[in-house]
Amino acid sequence: MKPLKPLTGAQIRQMYLDFFQSKGHAIEPSASLVPIEDPTLLWINSGVATLKKYFDGRVIPQNPRIVNAQKSIRTNDIENVGKTARHHTFFEMLGNFSVGDYFREDAIKWGWELLTSDEWYGLDPDRLSVTIHPEDDAARQIWLELGVPAERIIPLEDNFWEIGEGPSGPNTEIFFDRGPAFGDDPNDSELYPGGENERYLEIWNIVFSQYNHDGHGNYTELPRKNIDTGMGLERMASVMQDVPTNFDTDLFMPIIHKTEEISGKRYREDTKLDVAFKVIADHIRTVAFAIGDGALPSNEGRGYVLRRLLRRAVRYAKMLGIERPFMYELVDTVGSVMVDFYPQVPEKADFIKRVIKNEEERFHETLHDGLAILNTVAQAAKNNGEHIISGEDAFRLYDTYGFPLELTVEYAEDHQMSVDEEGFKRAMDEQRKRARAAREDGGSMQQQSEVLATLTVPSQFVGYTDLEADAKIIALLHDGERVTEVAAGEEAQLLLDVTPFYAESGGEVADSGTITGPDFVLDVKDVQKAPNGQNLHTVVVRTGIALADASVHAAVEASSRQAITKNHTATHLLHKALKDTLGTHVNQAGSLVSAERLRFDFSHFGAVTAEELATIEQDVNQAIWASLAVEIEEMNIADAKAKGAMALFGEKYGETVRVVSAGTYSIELCGGIHVRNTAEIGLFKIVSESGIGAGTRRIEAVTGAGAYHVMNGHLQTLEQAARVLKTKTTEVPGRIEALQVQLRETERAHESLQAKLANIEAASLKDDVEQINGVQVLAKQVDVSDMDALRGMMDELKSSLGSAIIVLGSAQGDKVNLVASVSKDLIDQGYHAGKLIKEVATRCGGGGGGRPDMAQAGGKDPAKLNEALAFTSHYVQSLA
């Protein structure tokens, strides 16, 4: 048997990229795990996920042959992670892709060459088998020509790839035979390549994307056929390194060794503990990379995924005897393992560790809170005469507090109870179905638009320097089809051979303006990039009939453009000020640059304080008032990075980039339009700062005249306040503080008076106390202003009556407030304030509850308050 090459994970990755680069492929950088332009995805979950724009025809790539190593996250099988050899939440997918270029034959032959050639991976061909779709005769023939025996070419009906609407097609897979040690039972019906077994490991998958699926079962041939190939790095590492699981490769073992060092336990000595080692190693990779790409733990979306993963790892760490925050200590190890291809984890290690440590500390506190909730749930069940914790409650504890089912089961057993595990599984299945439906809905690609894809005629953009240009309409479209004319009032799309109109990009909105022909006028409503990179104008024919091939004059609306450029340059200054004030972890997470305002979304852990906002605003204005020259250069991307240019989070750049510098203060890669000097911006004013999601903040601001109007509005408000307060504008804060002091004194006097009145009324209520079967009972409607006053009166009565059951109610408008008290000696006799108040409240249209000694409730029907209070006597008699 041919020996295996002992390649490291880094060598396997680099060899894959080098091989396909030698076959004319362009290397596509690994995209951020946080999707930038795809709201349908929670995470980038495959190598092809970042290339959908190429496959559905929205964008034509410069090179139709692409290769990448894409970091990915999938969490749909999280419960299997650590328990199987190959389930992961974070993994790398190596892929080679053809967008309308080579197809089946080259894809298969190149895959075989890379896998079997001694120059590359050098696998033994005798240990490889393939699967194909039963109707894919072309693939079968190619495999036979490569020397694969017919008995190792297995037809499988499942070899057809589709994810809803869009491109689809048959696929072929390559399997590696790990040997009889992983399965040698001739009676095992699953022991074949493609079956459920451990012996035959899938290492390669090629999708022949040749159909468009309309989502209704109809398939049509794609005008341009595509190739989508995937090879999992972790799986391939387990093959080349000849180890039983992915976790035993050099991609995981350094993390496991570090965990051994922290825990004092040894990997591979106890099967149950091995699961814990694997879970921790997997989850820290996911969390470290995701935080490095801008995601932060939270209670929603991708932030919730991170929170669950961290909490799951912490729970498994308890099996290893680790009872303190420790995951953050593994970040440096993750960074060192992956640094060859992913430098961002080491670069952001301090921030990543701070976030993880904070989350771990919070979870250790949450565990105590969860136990308190679990105790309440169990007690409530017992109070209702039940000895089972419902599946819904168990799942809520799991989903909200990170409590595993087994922990809830252990607790229940300690309290002579059980858990509805079937109900828990049903709740879990429902959540998975919802998640699966969301993935299927969001994973599909758009159908190819052949009309736009075939528009390859060049168009020159002159808008960086000119706001007007004489041009020619080189393509005119109406309802998606090429036409020769479009009538007045109709909407159309067109290309110009020369255009001053900027196409929406990088958050900067498109220019507006007019296009004037010999006998027609067009209003430009929008400009977007066409698949082949030209600026595609959406217009409405204001007058006349728009004609293809007509000579026209294109004019950008100057005042709007001027305002947009001010706001765009201001976003660059804001980005720099944010990093200077909050930290280098700040990354742009989205932006909108319009004529009216700018909006800047950025990653940050926690709210921005008023002091920090003031510093940020001041720094931006200082840069504006410094009259910094804004210079624009085109250079090699390596030179740009050496110059210190900020590459925007999630963006992909070619070899030549456009660098926008505002003096030495701000240097960014940007294709947008800017002022020539920061002084043109005039003034910068932040109007709002808020959180918009997990670890993402948003600042909205205005510049120039917009900033003046905002500040003038603030001044007018201040002057109006001064008039109302009858003081000078400079003395408004002091006057307000004085009024607040007066108000607090008045409130204290009011509260004191209320307390005295309550005491007087409480004293008079003693005459209304009833004796029922030897128990003092007081149930009375009283006249107080709010719940606080009602509780104060209750405290007075409890003190004076001693052993008693008291229920007080008050009505304010259409609202009822209720409080109940049961003294300790009567609790021992079976009386319960929470149960009593619940019954009283239901009789006046409300609800509530509480402890055995004290409870409160509300109602919505004041007319029934006295009737409800009368129930108290019945309650006492029923338990006598």
UniProtKB/Swiss-Prot annotation:
Role this protein plays: Catalyzes the attachment of alanine to tRNA(Ala) in a two-step reaction: alanine is first activated by ATP to form Ala-AMP and then transferred to the acceptor end of tRNA(Ala). Also edits incorrectly charged Ser-tRNA(Ala) and Gly-tRNA(Ala) via its editing domain.
Enzyme Commission designation: 6.1.1.7
Binding, Zn(2+): H568, H572, C670, H674
Principal subcellular localisation of the protein: cytoplasm
Gene name per UniProt: alaS
Pfam families, per database record: DHHA1, tRNA-synt_2c, tRNA_SAD
GO MF assignments: alanine-tRNA ligase activity; aminoacyl-tRNA deacylase activity; ATP binding; catalytic activity, acting on a protein; transferase activity; tRNA binding; zinc ion binding
Gene Ontology process terms (BP): alanyl-tRNA aminoacylation
Protein name (Swiss-Prot/TrEMBL): Alanine--tRNA ligase
Cofactor(s) the protein requires to work: Zn(2+)
Record's comment describing the protein's domains: Consists of three domains; the N-terminal catalytic domain, the editing domain and the C-terminal C-Ala domain. The editing domain removes incorrectly charged amino acids, while the C-Ala domain, along with tRNA(Ala), serves as a bridge to cooperatively bring together the editing and aminoacylation centers thus stimulating deacylation of misacylated tRNAs.
InterPro entries with a match to the protein in the record: aa-tRNA-synth_II/BPL/LPL, Ala-tRNA-lgiase_IIc, Ala-tRNA-ligase_IIc_anticod-bd, Ala-tRNA-synth_IIc_core, Ala-tRNA-synth_IIc_N, Ala-tRNA_ligase, Ala_tRNA_ligase_euk/bac, DHHA1_dom
Protein family according to the UniProt entry: Belongs to the class-II aminoacyl-tRNA synthetase family.
Disulfide bridges in this chain: none
A single Gene Ontology CC term: cytosol
Annotated cofactor note: Binds 1 zinc ion per subunit.
Keywords, alphabetical: Aminoacyl-tRNA synthetase, ATP-binding, Cytoplasm, Ligase, Metal-binding, Nucleotide-binding, Protein biosynthesis, RNA-binding, tRNA-binding, Zinc
Catalytically driven reaction(s): tRNA(Ala) + L-alanine + ATP = L-alanyl-tRNA(Ala) + AMP + diphosphate
Organism: Exiguobacterium sibiricum (strain DSM 17290 / CCUG 55495 / CIP 109462 / JCM 13490 / 255-15)
